[in-house]
Amino acid sequence: MDKKTQGAWLLHHARKLQATTNQDFDSIAFAGKSGTLLSAISAERQSVVTQQRLEALARANHISPKTELPAIVAELARQKLILPGSGGVEVLGLTGHSVLEHTSRIFDESSHEAHEEAVIFVSEIASETPTTDKAIAEVVSDNLKLSRKEVGDTLDLATNIGFFDSEPISAQEKLLFNGNLFRRDDARKVNAILSTLKAPEAALLTEVNQKLQETGCLPLET
């Protein structure tokens, strides 16, 4: 997964966490809020953002000026993205489209837990193709060294928060998907079709998806 994609998921998940009291994804929440504030600052036309304006931007993005803003400002300063002063902060050559990469780096450099990486990893997979929790649990467990129980608990918690969606397809299995991209009926149909693909066909589909992700479109051969 490239850093811009990871940054986008961090912003998305941080917004979902605002509606909960869950404390299991602190690094995601912090990186996402840092990126959100960074995005707001980058949209300002001034090279210096006053403290009053900075606090207003924080409140507008559900960031507490007293309990959360100081730590976020300190992190952005550590990343050399802003320079704090007595009356506000100076923006150091920040551009809007670099925000996602900066957000990703803040998360990567944090002391985050493996289950936080897992929900980002699963979110990306589920947005590409609906997949079962059984299939994804094996991949996540192997890649991130989590036990099957830890993966299962993480997937349940993530779906309850709304990082991605799930739909039971049997007594022992759930379908994971992105509800913004796939309706529930469509997700089940896609999964049913994909489960019938032979290995060479599945490999070709993976190759096409990778090319689409890299280029955004593919030429139509006539």
Q: Where do the model's predicted regions map?
A:
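Non-catalytic recognition/regulatory regions in large multidomain proteins
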Residues: 1-222
